[in-house]
Amino acid sequence: DSFLEANLMNFGIGLGVIPILGALLGLLHLQIVWWLFLLLALIMPIYDLFNYILKSGLIKSNFVKSNGDSNDVVNEINLKGIFNKIFGKIKFGELLKIKKSTIYVLLMLIMFICLFFVMNKGAFLNPWLENGDSWGHVGHIKYMELHKTYYTPGETQLTNYGIPYPPGYDILMTILFQISQSSYWALKFFNALLVSLATIFFYFFAKEFTNDKKIALFATLILTIIPSFLSHFIWSKTLAILLYFPALYCILRSEQNKKWLIPSIIIVASILITAPVTAFYLAPFLGILWLGKLIATKKLNLNIIYAALGGLVLSLLFWGDMFIRYTFKGVLIILNIVKVKGGTDATLTKLLHVHGTGATKYKFMDFIWVNTYNMINNPKGIGLVLSILVLFAVISFIYLFIYPFVSKYIQKYSKKDSKEDFKEDVK
């Protein structure tokens, strides 16, 4: 269980490192190429491996007398000892035993496989890309694949997803383009894979949050079957939303070990340079998490605040450069976060006038009922059954938590008032 969790979440954390690392390479005017990411990823494992071999005495130095007066040093590597050190402690019989906790992980992986099958099949049913969002991304990714950078000559914006639009999603896809024979296949396949990976990362976040594998598995099932969570539509929000779960997982782990703040900050920064709108959504998520923890533990839980502020500062590796190049107001205008009226006044549009999927306004039934057809980018609604479960959950929450609190509050002050009335009557 812990072995699977460690390796699967390492994969999620690694995904969260790529966008901000790519932004750093771009800022330093280094090429965004797959082998450089691989080299940087192997530095620490290779260092740890050699450090382990040296400390364990698996490399022995022998002094051999040469023909001259001096001695030559010959290093002998004990390959048999290395093999025994690595594999000697592994009890292969125990590996075949499946623990109860491992069954939950395997069930979650079945959900992942099913979701990936659906998303991958749907992505390749059409021989073309969906709409302008997909073509905008593929145009910018192709430019980055050829020129190894997200910077364009002057202030030219080749597509609507060129800078100052955050390049996190395109950085990841550029690396995958470079190692794939077909750009078309890479974009569709890996985008569907990103959507499906949310199942894995959400399960471990939910397990960490609830400290209950059964609740985590049920919550993962609900997320997997919700039609409106994510689709195979190609846009940067897919990666940004996916990274929420590794970020929240690391933030929760930082309560036990402060070292987890490092990946927390890195992943939060990557979210902030992947999709502008989704970056704004992150603040309420972290705020709700902080408030819930405050109520439950009566502690400030500063780790959540540190992760948010640290990620914001680290994201300035990209945003700071963009604000210098285009000015703060210019970036907001280009990203259509503000709208210019009369050439001078800028008023907030996207943040104050929130629309639903496909820029349409949601009606009440859009949240409950799921149509047999989708919008061009994402389905609507959570379904009738889940809506009933949500209603039941809200009623249960009010009955179990809100009602006792209010009742206790009323009784406390009603007794206080009755005592004061009694004293006045006595007087």
Regions found by a protein language model. Give the residues of each.
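Transmembrane alpha-helical segments of multipass membrane enzymes and assembly factors
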Residues: 1-5, 23, 201-216, 253-256
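Membrane-embedded, hydrophobic transmembrane alpha-helices
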Residues: 1-99, 399
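Membrane-interface helix-loop-helix junctions at transmembrane boundaries of multi-pass membrane enzymes
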Residues: 96-99, 297-305, 378-384, 392-427
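Active-site lumenal/periplasmic loops and adjacent helix-entry segments of GT-C-fold
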Residues: 96-243
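Membrane-interface transmembrane helices that cradle and orient dolichyl/undecaprenyl
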Residues: 208, 244-261, 271
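Perimembrane helix-loop-helix junctions
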Residues: 282-309
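Membrane-lumen/periplasm interface segments of specific transmembrane helices
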Residues: 295, 304-346
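Alpha-helical transmembrane segments at the extracellular/periplasmic loop-to-helix junctions
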Residues: 340-408
